[in-house]
Amino acid sequence: MNRYTTMRQLGDGTYGSVLMGKSNESGELVAIKRMKRKFYSWDECMNLREVKSLKKLNHANVIKLKEVIRENDHLYFIFEYMKENLYQLMKDRNKLFPESVIRNIMYQILQGLAFIHKHGFFHRDMKPENLLCMGPELVKIADFGLARELRSQPPYTDYVSTRWYRAPEVLLRSSVYSSPIDVWAVGSIMAELYTFRPLFPGTSEVDEIFKICQVLGTPKKSDWPEGYQLASSMNFRFPQCIPINLKTLIPNASSEAIQLMTEMLNWDPKKRPTASQALKHPYFQVGQVLGPSAHHLDAKQTLHKQLQPPEPKPSSSERDPKPLPNILDQPAGQPQPKQGHQPLQAIQPPQNTVVQPPPKQQGHHKQPQTMFPSIVKTIPTNPVSTVGHKGARRRWGQTVFKSGDSCDNIEDCDLGASHSKKPSMDAFKEKKKKESPFRFPEAGLPVSNHLKGENRNLHASLKSDTNLSTASTAKQYYLKQSRYLPGVNPKNVSLVAGGKDINSHSWNNQLFPKSLGSMGADLAFKRSNAAGNLGSYSAYSQTGCVPSFLKKEVGSAGQRIHLAPLGASAADYTWSTKTGQGQFSGRTYNPTAKNLNIVNRTQPVPSVHGRTDWVAKYGGHR
């Protein structure tokens, strides 16, 4: 290790930490992965999956393992250095990618994946963080810590890949999955490249399946019988959902892109295309030169000369806490000052002007050599700098597109993303100021974003926009499917609204009282349970409820509750019977009459000379 100088830490994961280093001989920048566990022999080292897989893989779109060093029982992997990962590349942009850029990124990902599968491995952890970039022009697959050989014998472990990119057969605990799980993950990544939002942002494994069903619809038993067997074995039933056209969720994607994503995101792994088959899809047959360009293949030499890393600063990752197995995962981010969200600016999708793709020809695609031009010693003049974290991943529910329109008007939409998955203290204090413990939020107030985890941007999706079309969008769809609405107590909803439908504007209507009525005002009560629970009543009028200090319990018979009189006798107070009683059959209930019979006791027996007259009380002779 004395041949390398470590400069700063790039990341820290479950199995090891990643450092940025420089070769003392050539000055070349490298990424050094230091394993946490100790290795006492070379045989132990060579049995690692990462070593076994990477030493066999040499491809322009697969990260290069330069050497393995064992020193003082510590193991070090020396990798080529890459500027950033795909997640950081998306996060740091304020404009969506044009489709030509997405096509080139997807082509490189599928090229690398096809090479991995061809050599008998599948990755098992495909996600944007494990796709390393030198800008959008060069993408490489990294982190083979979970890779398996295709010929290895199942059962495999059930926990693989990050949840948002996990295939349904893995979510249903299949033990015989294979390379199609990588194709599913690539389909999810492709959708995210168009929108900068995860397509299936589940908060748990079960919620992940719900999110998939909400987009793809409930699978039919005839379409995926193995899936129903897996579901029944773990006592799971698929939720009944109607599929959404991906064009609604990804309006800036061409029809060929939608078709390719639909094929890769098939419930049945046997029906998904392989990576090689996906490369032959018409989506890639547009006459565009795909693959890394020559000067980006040599961009690392530019970094060696121009990139002077700053002093180490603590990175501020604002994403969900996850293991960081990525070997080159995250350049050290520098703390960013709080700033307002910048709306995403859409780039006109190129498919509107591009010529229709020519018919599929066998000879057209068999030009892999042209896709990987020779290395030319040209050095770009633009310096490369590391960019810190600016915000968390953007979510569904913030963008409303006009159906049938292009992305030109995306600049008018509210595309700001929350900078944290946790609620900010400012937002929480603001909510406390605007809400009192005795009332619902006012109709015009925004609902505070204190939901946990993935629902952090739901309140932004609830804002009405009269200028935009009410076409079925991801915002409206997820809102309809939500099991609860923020700021609304479901118990009070069932109490007041009865069987009425609660929609996204529930807190704007008159179902929810804005303030309590005055003490001692006319109180209307209805019988909430005519058959039993004689003492249970619920507030029915608009005047609110009665505080507990105005109530008093009398006796144990029937467990009645009476209102304490406010300056008048009990005879002046009666229960008002309004329309709420009309819906119950049987005789009417007069609580005054019945309760008075219960409360009235026999007159006390007069005492004799100040003592109780037991004979008068119990009978007998004096």
Curated annotation (Swiss-Prot):
Residue ranges of domain Protein kinase in the record: 4-284
Keywords on record: ATP-binding, Cell projection, Cilium, Cytoplasm, Cytoskeleton, Developmental protein, Differentiation, Kinase, Magnesium, Metal-binding, Nucleotide-binding, Nucleus, Phosphoprotein, Serine/threonine-protein kinase, Spermatogenesis, Transcription, Transcription regulation, Transferase
Record GO cellular component, one term: photoreceptor connecting cilium
Annotated InterPro entries: Kinase-like_dom_sf, MAP_kinase, Prot_kinase_dom, Protein_kinase_ATP_BS, Ser/Thr_kinase_AS
Predominant localisation class: nucleus
Post-translational modifications: Autophosphorylated. Phosphorylated on serine and threonine residues.
Chain sites annotated for binding ATP: L10, G11, D12, G13, T14, Y15, G16, S17, V18, K33
Compartments in which it is found: Nucleus; Cytoplasm; Cytoplasm, Cytoskeleton, Microtubule organizing center, Centrosome; Cytoplasm, Cytoskeleton, Spindle
Active-site annotation: D125
Cofactor(s), names only, from the UniProt record: Mg(2+)
Record region (Disordered): 301-373
Tissue/organ expression: Expressed mainly in testicular cells at and after meiosis.
Domain of life: Eukaryota
BP GO terms, sorted: cell differentiation; cilium assembly; intracellular signal transduction; intraciliary transport; negative regulation of non-motile cilium assembly; non-motile cilium assembly; photoreceptor cell maintenance; protein autophosphorylation
Catalysed reaction equations from the record: L-seryl-[protein] + ATP = O-phospho-L-seryl-[protein] + ADP + H(+); L-threonyl-[protein] + ATP = O-phospho-L-threonyl-[protein] + ADP + H(+)
Subunit structure: Interacts with RP1. Interacts with AR and CDK20. Found in a complex containing MAK, AR and NCOA3. Interacts with FZR1 (via WD repeats).
The protein, known as: Serine/threonine-protein kinase MAK
Organism, as annotated: Rattus norvegicus (Rat)
